[in-house]
Amino acid sequence: MSVQNGFTAKIIRFVPHFVALRLSWTHNDLKAEGLEQFVEECLPAIRENNPQVKYFLQRSYTTCDPFVVGEYSWLRHRKKRVNWKSKEQVLSMIEEMSIGGDYREGYKRGVNRRLPRGQELWDTETMGHDVFHVTSKWKADIPEEDELPITAKTHPNFTYRKY
C-alpha cells in the first residue's frame, strides 16, 4: 500500500504568519526514527520552497521525546510530539502547520491571525477624532503637515470592526 501524501513535501508553502520550524530528536533512537527520515528525505525540499522560514534542528544524545514546533508571529506556536511516527505522519503534521495550525474548522483550531488587542486600532475608537492628533483645549494650534507621521487612517494595524 503506497502512501498518499509522499509528494506533498515539494508543494508545501507556509502561510505568511509562519515564522520558524523547530525539530528536536534523539540521535539513533527508535521512537525518533521517523523524524530522522523526514529530516533526511523531505526537509530539503521544504527548505528549498520556503526560504523565508527559519529552521532549527536540535539533535540530542540524551534520551528525550521528539517534537515538532511551529512558531507563528506574535509568539504563537503549535507543538506536536512525534513519538513512534513514520516520516509520512511527520510530513502530515508539518503540512497541517503550514496551512495555519489545524485541518479542522472550528473555534480556536487554527492559529489566530489577528494581532493582540493592544496592537490594533479599531475604527470605533477613532469615530469623530484622530487619536494621534493632540490639540490644545482652545483648539487654536496651527496644524503642521510634517508634524504627524502617522494618523489613524494611515496606522499599519487599523482595523474595521464588523460588529
Swiss-Prot record:
Cellular component terms (Gene Ontology): mitochondrion
Domain of life: Eukaryota
Listed InterPro entries: Thioredoxin-like_sf
Protein name per the record: Uncharacterized protein T09A5.5
Species the sequence originates in: Caenorhabditis elegans
Biological classification of the source: Eukaryota, Metazoa, Ecdysozoa, Nematoda, Chromadorea
